[in-house]
Amino acid sequence: MTLNLKNFFNPKIKMSKMGEFQELKPISGLEISSVSADLYNDGRDDISLFYFKDGANFAAVYTTSRITSASINWNLKIKRHFVKALMVNTKNANTFTGIKGAQGLKEIAHTLSKSLTLKSSQTTEGAKDIIKITDLLFASTGVIGEEFPHIKIKNRIPELVKKLRVEQNKFVWFKTASAIMTTDIRPKLAYEECKIGNKLVKISGIAKGSGMIAPNMATMLSFIFTDANIPSVFLKAILKKVIATTFNSITVDSDTSTNDMVAIFSTGKVKNSKIYNILDPKLQDFEKALHRLSLNLAKQIVVDGEGAKKFVTINVVGATSLSAAKNIGFSVANSPLFKTAIAGEDPNWGRIVMAIGKSGENIVANKIQIKIGDFIVAEQNAVAKEYDEEKLREYMKWGSINIEINLNLGKSSY
């Protein structure tokens, strides 16, 4: 399959920035913090923590990609709908990192659970709340395929826990929203209020997203917090309904990421009247407020979008059928982020992984091998042992680039 990528490029339309940053109010029952694990080597905050001292009901919607990050895999195994904390890292997606990525995340979970348990034991009440690793959720965003820097992150957890703050002023929210960014130009924050019965409830939300934004979400993370008392089953139903007309209705570059996550947490600190049914009229105002907040964040993501000319040949082999090979090939070729990497002479093969995963075809991550030129860059669900980024970077400067994707599932090719 041969494609001239210059046919795909259009001048980037400059969009005006949205208005001033919205001031978020504190959510009772939530503590937040962010610190630098020096993942960017520039001292910026790159890990953040959201802690619920008394726990929180939660609901989440994840990527539709068939290749998912270790953090998404972890969260999907959590069967409880009541959690104690969410930890987020940027710079590294922890995707296509193999068993090491999963093990690294587990080590982080153990360290975090111990640190939070210690914090709990130091309260004035003296009560010790044992926080298990199954009480924790994780989110990662960044480059696909790079070794997960779990030791760097793990070493900063005590400081991250120490810096947890109950009072979230606008500077704390801004700092934390900035800590989850990757290629974003600016942090994204939104706030709404509504009533459930006669009780006023608050909803605060932050998001990141700039590249890989498409219907069905994409490198997009959004975390929403409310002090309302709403059971997880109703949070899930409302969230799915709201996402359908907000986050899943935007597109920047048509790519679905491996790390997408939108989650809502309810601390229950406002003692609104009990909700027994999803059709309860008392939920209508909350749903409308959540929709306004989500649409606000989704629009901020669109405004913050990313940006790329060469002759590229993509061969897909080892597929189960011709149509599967063709679909995967075009999924990669039509990916604007893949084209951006080509035009920018960037050896970011993780974008090929992303495009394979979002094709919708049946694949087995452990069997995929990716070659760029004569260089094997990925195989067995991880970066290739012989991978040499400097040699690949030189190859990316060529005017003609060849890519081979071997699915190792069948005999069809395209």
Please provide the spans of the model-predicted regions.
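Short, low-complexity intrinsically disordered segments enriched in small and basic residues
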Residues: 120-127
